């Protein structure tokens, strides 16, 4: 249904997204936002309060291992379909995750995503027709518009609001913490996307 030129202007694309969201509000379709993000021991926390005389120190871990997260987020019901990996995220990893996702949809589903090269590669594009036959439609955002991808808000909250300092003490702690945040989203952790 979204066969028009990929590079619509910002306001036209935003109107198209609002139209899709109105269909979702009527339960005609499901709408999800897709993106990837990464977490490492190189802390995103800009400052931390500690008692006087007891400074909290986090060792610098430049070039630390990274936990990559892929996620589909439905902001209507806060359903999050996600996966973590410590491997590099490439087109094939994204395709495999899309295949997992499409196998669990129950009605026509629109996925809103950015134009990252792994989403626009020949390998990725070769899968689109198969996904469309299974009820999955892709709606690409205009360039440089992360504010239209609501899952970016979740990544921001995970990095800057929900993190506990103890998560940065070891890679295992961080991995467990990221998994707990993802598993607890919608129950223990909530965001009002409106």
Predicted features along the sequence, with ranges:
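Short functional hotspots at interaction and active-site rims
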Residues: 1-194
